[in-house]
Amino acid sequence: MNKEKIEKKTALITGGTYGIGFGIAKELLEKGMNVTITGRKEETTNAAAKKLADKYPGKVLGSFGDVRRMADMNKISKETRETFGNIDVLVANAGVGHFGSIEELTEEQWNQTIETNLTGVFNSVKASLPALIDSKGYIITVASLAGTNFFANGSAYNASKFGLVGFTQAIMLDLRQKGVKVSTIMPGSVTSHFAGHTPNDEDQWKIQPEDLGKMVVDLLEMNPRTLPSKIEVRPSMPPKR
């Protein structure tokens, strides 16, 4: 995949109804790609898809489902292929964050974090893989700097993101001989509603979702012989404390 061929390709973006996923969707649509965005709730997914489709008619599919369920991801993959013909890019972005000391963390919070941030990516990749092998496509996972840097109150989130970085690097080795490229983007602080945060004016120093969207475009337009496998992204000028 390169600059001349990105137009009219199809991307499936999990967790695409807001934040990072929505920002990536906007940038790919701006480049002429078809985009499927996913979310867990039908109403939210349809509303986000309509917002994009109003500007990019005929280029957007909203498909709801839970990445934790393989059956849901198989459905979403099928709907994407039926609508656009194939899947050329998978952006595995859906994620959750539960934070607190190991004494406070509940079994439910642990399971939801691991099942969404790690098992959900496995399900997304498995459901899309036949199409991606056929198209010699690109898998991009959205991890975090928490995938290589641990912090207090982050046991579940750290475990899920460390695991995601390892998973992505391993499948990169599995799939490169099949013509499928695999990268992981590891952002630091991003302006979004993630983990219950409400964006405000003080977030201007943070990475913006569209910044990561432009980075995905750069990866897709890069010379096919080049593969940045692990990309750490930090705000260039964090606030003074």
Task: Give the location of each predicted region.
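Conserved glycine-rich cofactor-binding loop
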Residues: 17-19, 41
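Substrate-binding pocket helix/loop in short-chain dehydrogenase/reductase
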Residues: 101-102, 109-111
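C-terminal helical subdomain
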Residues: 184-185, 192, 201-241
